[in-house]
């Protein structure tokens, strides 16, 4: 679809996965029949960003992980809306310096559970054009591992890092990030596992985060400067941590505005507008309802299930 730009984006994505040792090739001779049957194909998604550049993302089919992970393991904590709003209010009231940050490729910086700890190996099957890209990147490592299945070239790899698409990926990253933060003195809030505080220069530094999106605040901007350096030292080896300073921050779909002293304004107009623009079903003028709960919602017996496309739209929006 995206031509040479798409290929370049795919190469860049696979290259950075290889640099981070996200997977290792597995000989078909060393695999059990069960491992081979459970291996799912890797998918490469290409999307066009706002700046017209193409972003590639290799995604793992999450179905195999459902079988050996508990419900608790696949449910990653999420910052409460109240926590986001209350910490923003405290930042404004105390006149704190605020910094928002985004850690690149967070999931793949977290290691998968080791097979010798009672967990099964997670095997991924790479097929099609992705095989050619892997061989181009490292022919000596991946070339001998190619096998043919139904006329297709296939490479099996053992997944070593939490790749996007895995149900456990967000939780593995959370556990790693939490451990790192506790190592530098942060104490986590007992009511919200995505909020943490520590004392620095006789004042509180507060961080709140949702996966890899972080907001840090402290009275002294130098504390945030040092925290930014620490984030890059720990998680920016293969791509710098992006940060935003100043009075206005685009964070978790909200525009957080501290321009008025002692006040904070939360604006989600842009987020709602983008959501409406991206919504695939277009309504005609006047085709509205005051409520989705019509008078017939509980009548008429068993209704027909909506089709797959509409179900996915409902889940997304």
Each language-model region and where it sits:
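Long, low-complexity, charge-biased intrinsically disordered regions
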Residues: 1-317
